[in-house]
Structure formats: structure tokens, C-alpha cells
Swiss-Prot record:
Any one of the GO CC terms: host cell nucleus
Motif Nuclear localization signal, chain ranges: 121-128
Function in brief: Isoform large T antigen is a key early protein essential for both driving viral replication and inducing cellular transformation. Plays a role in viral genome replication by driving entry of quiescent cells into the cell cycle and by autoregulating the synthesis of viral early mRNA. Displays highly oncogenic activities by corrupting the host cellular checkpoint mechanisms that guard cell division and the transcription, replication, and repair of DNA. Participates in the modulation of cellular gene expression preceeding viral DNA replication.
Protein name per its UniProtKB record: Large T antigen
Annotated ranges, domain SF3 helicase: 391-586
Record's keyword annotation contains Transport: no
Organism: Bovine polyomavirus
Domain-level remarks: The J domain is essential for multiple viral activities, including virion assembly, viral DNA replication, transformation and transcriptional activation.
């Protein structure tokens, strides 16, 4: 069933194509026309029906005229092959034809020629002169390279050299270009503004040198090559008088950079391990010392002590540096490295002396001519701490002796007592006095390894507010603190080194530091209790609480938790002989200042005020 001529024209119009073509073309045109005529696409329903009818009719007609070849090797293919070749052998393909002879031609041997003529002699191969020998050691001889240069030498004929001179100068806007004659040929010495490949220069010149020889080289040693070219005959150059020697060796001012060592020394002197804090502190040095307002601040005497011209000049460079954080990170790493070296090489007594020397320097700043604090306020805090325990000076002295000697299984002080009895205050003061870190032992076991990593290179540690599972007070929350401590027997004993780790750092093997364990009234496991060398129980005293509340000068400024306050407690209550020889001079000096500025009578009055819950400073 074939399409009539009218139906054929109608189908062409609906498909919008000049010719239907084969089945594949018909199908593509039909799918495209469906998007136009389909009612869902906004087309005419009648036109779509008519298109579908005519398409199906045309597809049947096309398939009827298309023969399909059966699969090779099957019986159907054998039958098709016989039908296809039927009658082929009977056809006579012979053609009776006689060729007329061509004009009489004499067979001439190859290369024969008419008498009297002469063959054109073959052209001799053109030879290009070698590149000037005197320049070879200063140019690159690489055949294929992507390296870029800003200095080139072109070697070509005398005529092409004159032609290339203005062409190159216009194309590359050369800083310098000169044309020389060398043994009858041209040498072009070129310095461009930017860098280019040798083949780019060669491609430009080859457009002018289709027949003439051309050699382009990148120059490795521009000054030496120019000096050799100056021995040739000069034809032209774009700079009158040529290039001065200073062109190749310009006098450059030495670029000043940030002195990293100076920043590291500053970080070590203030023992800063926080990169962001160090960055802020060092940027304060950008102002000249004589105009610095920070130096006039009585609370910033450490800044005044370090603010010198060297730091000011370096801080100005540091201010414009793009690597501020990197510099500060390295400086803080230097502080940590020095601390680790001290922990490995110094005795614990020497480490404590260093710590206390820093505290004495801080006391000079606080109570000196520029300081804002009053020694009497600190001594009020000392008398309050002394009232916490009947033998507080002896407790502190024995604790310091214990952490300095650091004997195995004789390394920890247990502070136990009810809520709000002063355990945390004592622990914080001793950390300020000796240096150390706080550890949260109540965390889950999987986090415990990184928590213990805080003890790396520390003098002492505090296991703060350790929780247990049983207690005499039902109101206390239970926890796994003592269970975790029980699993850290090697850490508490201090007999063998243990592995400590922090995130993004390698493990460190060291003896775990001694320290303090504070807890409320929990039942302590026996295996933990026997590892507590000193045990101190504190009691809640309402008058202590009341006197502290009435004396804002002491509680508001956190004097009770300051290492300086605890050092003053030892200075006042212990004899000079209890201190090492390096510190005895400072101890004598501060004993005299306490006697002069406060006096025993006022201190006795402070003690009575504390016992009565009054303002400690009231006379």
C-alpha cells in the first residue's frame, strides 16, 4: 500500500521537510513533527491524526521495498544467496572491441632529448653559513624547548637583516635592538619587554626569509653576548650609544624582610604559645616607643620592657607581611621546643626557680612605681588562704617539696571536702605557683588519650573535680572519674614513662607529671587512695565566705587563685633558709617590703576580721 502523490505532498507538508528520504529520515522528521502537531503541545488534533495515518502508511510502504539480508551461515542465507546469483553465470560480459593503433611513435629511451638541445643542470644544494662561533657559548642550542627568553640573536643575510630590523621592532616593541654585520651577514641582537619562545621569534622572521637562511637563538648570557656583538660592525641600533653596563646589573636596594628570629625571641621571653595572641602583641610595636600609648599603661609593663626600636622596625615589616600567621606559628613552636628542651635537660628544682624568678619580676611590675596594685590587698588574700587550713603553709611547702623530688608513688596531693570549701581555689593557686595544666578525667575513655596529652611538657597537673560512683552524700552526681584514674596507675605512679599524644602531633614518651586530685565526698577506690601521697581535707567555713564577700578587692580580682599570692604566703610564713640560694635575696627583699608597707599589726587585724566574717582590710 503506497502513498498517492496527493498523500505524499500532504505528508511532506505535515513533516515540514522537502523530502521524506529513507526510513531513518522519515522517523526523525515524524518525531519532530509530533512536537508541533500533538494536542498536548498545543497542536491540532485532526492534523495529528492525519500525520499518524500517513506516517504509518509510508512506513509500511518503505519496509515493503526494503529487503533484509538473512544472517550469514543459516539456511535462509543460502537460499537468498542462490536467488541473488541466479542467472549471473548465464550473462555474457565479453566485449568485442578492437583498438585503433595510435600515431607512429618512436620509442625514446628515458632521459632522451631532441638533437641540438641541452639538459638543465641540477641545482646545487644551498648551504647556510654556521652560526658565529664567538656567540655559541652564550646562546641556547636546544632544538625543541618551551623555555621563554627576553633576549635573542637572529643570524641571516645582510639584505634580510635590514628588512627584519623594523619588522621585529614594530612587532615586539623591543627595549633594545641592534643590527651588526659579521662576515658579510647580519646579526640582530634583540631585548624584548616580555619573554617569548624562540620559535615565536623564528616564525615571525621566517615570513620574510622564504629563501634566505635564518637562525634564531635564545640568549643565556645577555651581557656577555652583547659585549661580543659590540666587536662587530654596527649598522643600526634604537638606543644612541648602546647599552650601559648598568643595564645588565642594575643597583637594587636590598629588600628588607621580617626578622623571624626577633619575633621568636620575643615569644620565648614572654613564653607565649598562642599564635593569635602573639600576632596581636607584636603588632602593638608598630608605633614608635616615644609615642606609644601602650607603654604608658601601668598594666602593660611587659610591653614597655620589650618595646625597642628594633622591634618597631620589624613590626612595621611584619604588619605588611602576608605570612603573619606562619611566622607566629613558628615562633610559638620555638617556645614549645625550648620548653621541651628545658624539661629534658634541667632539674625540677631549676625549673621551679625559673618559674619563681618570673613571678618575682611580675611582682616588681605590679607593686613597683608604675604598678597599680597594693601589697596590702595581696596580703589580705594571703591571710584568707592561711585560714583555709590550720597548717596551710606547711601543706604548701610539703607539696612543693613533693613535686620537686618527684619520687615514684609519692607524687600526688588529694584535696577532698564538701562543695564550696576551697579545693579548686587551692589547686588553681598551686598551678599558678608551680605551672601546669588542668585535666578533665571525667570524660569518656575514648577521649581520655587526648585529654592526657595536655600534660605534655608540663611541670604539674590537676585532676579537677573527679567524680566517683558512690558517695556519702546522695546529692552528688556520679561519674567515671575515679574509674578512669584507676586505669592510669602507671601515670599516677610515675615509675615508668608513658605515651602521651595530642591531635595532629606525634606521640611523646615521658614521665607523667605529679600534681593534685580534687574531689567531693566520694568513696575513693583503694587502688587510687594508696597512690595519694598527701591527703588534705578542707571544711566549709561560713565566716571565710562572708569575709571574702565583704572584701571585693580580693575576690573580684581573683587574688586567691594567683601564683603571686601563694608565693607571698610562702615568703611571709616560711623562713629564708627554706628557699634556694638563687631566690633568697628576693625573699629577703619582699619580707622587708611586707613588714614596711603592711606590718604585723595590720596582718593580725586581717586575721581577726576573717574569723569574724568582716571586711579583711578594715583596720
Amino acid at each position: 500500500m503506497e502513498l498517492t502523490s496527493e498523500e505524499y505532498e500532504e505528508l511532506r507538508g505535515l513533516l515540514g521537510t522537502p523530502d521524506i528520504g529513507n526510513a531513518d529520515t522519515l522517523k526523525k522528521a515524524f518525531l519532530k513533527a509530533c512536537k508541533v502537531h500533538h494536542p498536548d503541545k498545543g497542536g491540532n488534533e485532526e492534523a495529528m491524526k492525519r500525520l499518524l495515518y500517513l506516517y504509518n502508511k509510508a512506513k509500511i510502504a518503505a519496509s515493503a521495498t526494503t529487503s533484509q539480508v538473512p544472517e550469514y551461515g543459516t539456511s535462509q542465507w543460502e537460499q537468498w544467496w542462490e536467488e541473488f546469483n541466479q542467472g549471473f553465470d548465464e550473462q555474457d560480459l565479453h566485449c568485442d572491441e578492437e583498438l585503433e593503433p595510435s600515431d607512429n611513435e618512436e620509442e625514446n629511451p628515458a632521459g632522451s632529448q631532441a638533437p641540438g638541445s641541452q639538459a638543465t643542470p641540477p641545482k646545487k644544494p644551498r648551504t647556510s653559513p654556521d652560526f658565529p662561533e664567538v656567540l655559541k657559548e652564550y646562546v641556547s642550542n636546544a632544538l625543541f624547548t618551551n623555555r621563554t627568553y627576553n633576549c635573542f640573536i637572529i643570524f641571516t643575510t645582510a639584505e634580510k637583516g635590514k628588512e627584519l630590523y623594523p619588522c621585529i621592532q614594530a612587532a615586539y616593541k623591543c627595549t633594545f635592538i641592534a643590527l651588526y654585520m659579521y662576515n658579510g651577514d647580519s646579526v640582530l641582537y634583540i631585548i624584548t619587554v616580555g619573554k617569548h619562545r624562540v620559535n615565536a621569534m623564528e616564525n615571525l622572521c621566517s615570513k620574510k626569509c622564504t629563501v634566505s637562511f635564518l637562525q634564531a637563538k635564545g640568549v643565556l648570557k645577555p651581557q656577555e653576548a652583547y659585549n661580543v656583538c659590540c666587536t662587530f660592525e654596527l649598522i643600526s641600533q634604537n638606543i644612541q650609544g648602546g647599552l650601559p653596563s648598568s643595564f645588565f646589573n642594575p643597583v637594587q636596594e636590598e629588600e628588607k624582610s621580617v626578622n623571624w628570629k626577633l619575633i621568636s625571641e620575643f615569644a620565648c621571653s614572654i613564653k607565649c604559645t598562642d599564635p593569635l595572641l602573639l600576632m596581636a602583641l607584636y603588632l602593638e610595636f608598630t608605633t614608635a616607643p616615644e609615642a606609644c600609648k601602650v607603654c604608658d599603661n601601668p598594666r602593660r609593663l611587659e610591653h614597655r620592657r620589650h618595646h625597642t626600636k628594633d622591634h618597631t622596625l620589624n613590626a612595621l615589616l611584619f604588619q605588611d607581611s602576608k605570612t603573619q600567621k606562619t611566622i607566629c606559628n613558628q615562633a610559638c613552636d620555638t617556645v614549645l621546643a625550648k620548653r621541651r628542651l628545658d624539661m629534658k635537660t634541667l632539674t625540677r628544682n631549676e625549673l621551679l626557680v625559673q618559674r619563681w624568678q618570673g613571678l618575682f619580676q611580675e611582682m616588681e611590675d605590679l607593686f613597683g612605681a608604675r604598678g597599680e596594685e597594693h601589697l596590702a590587698h595581696r596580703m589580705a588574700a594571703v591571710m584568707w588562704l592561711n585560714a583555709l587550713h590550720p597548717n596551710m603553709p606547711d601543706v604548701i611547702f610539703n607539696y612543693i617539696k613533693m613535686v620537686v623530688e618527684n619520687k615514684p608513688k609519692q607524687r600526688y596531693l588529694l584535696l577532698k571536702g564538701p562543695v564550696n570549701c576551697g579545693k579548686t581555689t587551692v589547686a588553681a593557686g598551686l598551678i599558678g605557683l608551680c605551672g601546669g595544666a588542668y585535666l578533665n578525667i571525667n570524660c569518656p575513655p575514648e577521649r581520655l588519650a587526648f585529654e592526657l596529652g595536655m600534660a605534655i611538657d608540663q611541670f604539674t597537673v590537676v585532676f579537677e573535680d573527679v567524680k566517683g560512683k558512690k558517695s556519702s552524700k546522695s546529692s552528688l552526681q556520679t561519674g567515671i572519674g575515679f574509674e578512669n584514674l584507676d586505669n592510669l596507675r602507671d601515670h599516677l605512679d610515675g615509675a615508668v614513662p608513658v605515651n602521651l599524644e595530642r591531635k595532629h602531633q606525634n606521640k611523646v614518651t615521658q614521665i607523667f607529671p605529679p600534681g593534685i586530685v580534687t574531689c567531693n565526698e566520694y568513696d575513693i577506690p583503694l587502688t587510687v587512695k594508696i597512690r595519694m601521697y598527701q591527703k588534705v581535707e578542707l571544711l566549709h567555713n561560713y565566716n571565710l565566705y562572708k569575709s571574702l564577700k565583704n572584701t571585693e578587692e580580693v575576690g573580684k580580682k581573683r587574688y586567691l587563685q594567683s601564683g603571686i599570692t601563694w608565693l607571698l604566703l610562702l615568703i611571709y610564713f616560711r623562713s629564708v633558709d627554706d628557699f634556694t640560694e638563687k631566690l633568697q635575696e628576693c625573699v629577703v627583699k619582699w619580707k622587708e617590703r611586707i613588714e614596711t608597707e603592711v606590718g604585723d599589726m595590720w596582718l593580725l587585724t586581717m586575721k581577726e576580721n576573717i574569723e569574724q566574717g568582716k571586711n579583711i582590710l578594715e583596720k
